[in-house]
């Protein structure tokens, strides 16, 4: 019998119930997926920078951060900044959430796969998207050189951002013109990594599920 894969769900504090509901151990009547017997660790984004204390019944001081097969990051745009901690006058450095996630969870221990969930992956510019994708690649800029023909993620998204910036400054701009000017590799990246679901799409194709779990406000 194969051992169960170790999975971590990272989410904002306010979304805790969205995830713990589907844990089989809680045996919740609201769990429509109870037969799947889901088991995973649920933590907050802020728990990444806590070395002690509890989250639910989890002792943060005893977590083996490098032992997760899968990390699901809800509201992943909260990790759009790739800031790293700075040393103080005593030479000590406190890791940022981004640094803790990429260094201690994704790059340490076993091979970790990452799933990002976000309705707004880009807040400022395409560097937001780049930094989130780096969580998937463990910071490797050339990770898609063979699979998608993208030798440098950073270079591609910078080039794409430059095209968008110039296009946005034109008064009579149209979206078709932008699409024709963006690098073809940009669309290869989106096709290879993303699954997009709009509210309209969900309401049309997942009506039965919405009837069970609740509709959009």
Regions found by a protein language model. Give the residues of each.
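Conserved Walker A/P-loop ATP-binding site and its immediately adjacent core
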Residues: 1-25, 121-129
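Post-Walker A helix-loop "phosphate-sensing" segment adjacent to the P-loop in P-loop NTPases
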Residues: 2-4, 136-141
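Conserved nucleic-acid-binding Ia/Ib motif block in the N-terminal RecA-like helicase ATPase lobe
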Residues: 17-42
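CheY-like receiver
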Residues: 21, 131-134, 155
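Inter-lobe coupling linker of SF2 helicases/translocases
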Residues: 37-79, 83-121, 128, 138-217
């Amino acid at each position: 019998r194969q051992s169960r894969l170790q999975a971590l769900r990272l989410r904002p504090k306010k979304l805790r119930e969205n995830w713990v509901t589907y844990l089989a151990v809680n045996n919740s009547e609201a769990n429509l997926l109870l037969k799947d017997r889901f088991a995973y660790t649920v933590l907050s984004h802020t728990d990444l920078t806590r070395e002690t204390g509890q989250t639910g019944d989890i002792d943060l001081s005893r977590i083996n951060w490098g032992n997760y097969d899968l990390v699901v990051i809800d509201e992943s745009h909260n990790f759009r900044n790739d800031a790293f901690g700075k040393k103080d006058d005593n030479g000590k450095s406190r890791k940022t959430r981004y640094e803790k996630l990429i260094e201690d969870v994704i790059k340490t221990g076993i091979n970790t796969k990452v799933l990002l969930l976000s309705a707004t992956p880009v807040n400022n510019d395409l560097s937001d998207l780049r930094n989130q994708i780096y969580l998937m690649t463990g910071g490797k800029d050339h990770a898609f050189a063979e699979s998608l023909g993208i030798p440098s993620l950073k270079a591609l998204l910078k080039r794409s951002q430059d095209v968008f910036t110039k296009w946005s400054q034109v008064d009579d701009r149209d979206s078709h013109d932008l699409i024709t000017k963006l690098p073809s590799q940009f669309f290869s990246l989106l096709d290879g990594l993303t699954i997009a679901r709009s509210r309209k799409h969900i309401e049309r194709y997942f009506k039965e599920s919405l009837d069970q779990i609740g509709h959009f406000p």
